[in-house]
Amino acid sequence: MIKNPKVLILTAHYGNGHVQVAKTLEQTFRQKGIKDVIVCDLFGESHPVITDITKYLYLKSYTIGKELYRLFYYGVEKIYDKKIASWYANFGRKRLKLLLKAEKPDIVINTFPIIAVPELKKQTGISIPVYNVLTDFCVHKIWIHREVDRYFVATDHVKKVMVDIGVPAEQIVETGIPIRSSFELKINPDIIYNKYQLCKNKKILLIVAGAHGVLGSVKELCQSFMSVPDLQVVVVCGKNEALKQDLVGVQDTNPDALKVFGYVENIDELFRVTSCMITKPGGITLSEAAALQVPVILYKPVPGQENENAMYFERKGAAVVIRDDSEVFAKTEALLQDDMKLLQMKEAMKSIYRPEPAGHIVDTILAENHVEPNHIPIKSPALAQSFT
């Protein structure tokens, strides 16, 4: 039995999702009395220049590099068992060895497909449990290694795919993808309507435009949607200040029809009152939407995990996938007018959702390492003016 385990969570800043999952797991461990938790961006610390370049290319995949990313994602999948596996296994290895020597963790968790730890286990024989927390509704071979002790996955579908390619079923646990605890709280929606100056008698369209310009023609879309009767449009621009300033001028022409925000800390509040949402199909965003049963319109998924996520939600009846700019307004307006379709999509989201995934993952890890959790009660946060 380990009395006070040290937990090392490895992640990477490719998008916010992997880091967000790492922080959610860190918070959950701490809530269960495990105080010694370290979150490390292994690639960023090991190779900062290469990491910055690849992060830039990753973001460009949303605009000009879609075919390149398609080739990378599906090409690596096909040839992964060859030379790339050997090169990738050693990426970050030097920094990892120093980290393991200095921190001496009892448990290692990956929220990004980092195989340096299991590869080090294979080559050196070190005894340390390794857990992979997959952050999409699909699986890439790069996540899989014989020295990983357990995988936590979003759905039974992902589990079946992994079993089909040789991962023992008993090593895979279907938990859902960890999301922020705020998405699992109960909040009176009237408070939210008042806070954001929204009308509960109108439908609300939430557009999550993001900081990297992943949604095109936002200004023109907003102008079109503002003409739809009994509809309020809410746009979250993230840290894209230029987009926010561009939309504020549109908002001023009819502030009741359009609400524009920058970064919204408690974005779950907007999820709770929206009729449907236009967004990109990241695994964490979709998990959060499922938790609050928000029908989603998925805009032009990037080939790779985003496209796989989108196709899964589309098959389940929880999403409308749009691949052409010219279809955005017409398909969104049609959905907003189809109450039966919206209800069916909400039910589909409900069927996808797995409650308290972070708690399930942490409890499983602690139990397997014979650690008795010491629950620390956390008060529900009050609604705050946490938007810009």
From Swiss-Prot:
It is an enzyme of class 2 (transferase). GO terms for cellular component: plasma membrane. InterPro entries: Diacylglyc_glucosyltr_N (IPR009695), Glyco_trans_28_C (IPR007235), Glycosyltransf_28_UgtP (IPR050519), Pro_diacylglycrl_glcsylTrfase (IPR023589). It comes from the Bacteria. It is found in: Cell membrane. Keywords: Carbohydrate metabolism, Cell membrane, Glycosyltransferase, Lipid biosynthesis, Lipid metabolism, Membrane, Transferase. It catalyses: a 1,2-diacyl-3-O-(beta-D-glucopyranosyl)-sn-glycerol + UDP-alpha-D-glucose = a 1,2-diacyl-3-O-(beta-D-Glc-(1->6)-beta-D-Glc)-sn-glycerol + UDP + H(+); a 1,2-diacyl-3-O-(beta-D-Glc-(1->6)-beta-D-Glc)-sn-glycerol + UDP-alpha-D-glucose = a 1,2-diacyl-3-O-(beta-D-Glc-(1->6)-beta-D-Glc-(1->6)-beta-D-Glc)-sn-glycerol + UDP + H(+); a 1,2-diacyl-sn-glycerol + UDP-alpha-D-glucose = a 1,2-diacyl-3-O-(beta-D-glucopyranosyl)-sn-glycerol + UDP + H(+). Transmembrane segments: none annotated. One of its GO terms (biological process) is enterobacterial common antigen biosynthetic process. Its EC number is 2.4.1.315. GO terms for molecular function: 1,2-diacylglycerol 3-glucosyltransferase activity. Its main location: membrane. Pathway: Glycolipid metabolism; diglucosyl-diacylglycerol biosynthesis. Belongs to the glycosyltransferase 28 family. UgtP subfamily. Processive glucosyltransferase involved in the biosynthesis of both the bilayer- and non-bilayer-forming membrane glucolipids. Is able to successively transfer up to three glucosyl residues to diacylglycerol (DAG), thereby catalyzing the formation of beta-monoglucosyl-DAG (3-O-(beta-D-glucopyranosyl)-1,2-diacyl-sn-glycerol), beta-diglucosyl-DAG (3-O-(beta-D-glucopyranosyl-beta-(1->6)-D-glucopyranosyl)-1,2-diacyl-sn-glycerol) and beta-triglucosyl-DAG (3-O-(beta-D-glucopyranosyl-beta-(1->6)-D-glucopyranosyl-beta-(1->6)-D-glucopyranosyl)-1,2-diacyl-sn-glycerol). NCBIfam families: PRK13609.1. This is Processive diacylglycerol beta-glucosyltransferase. It comes from Bacillus cereus (strain 03BB102).
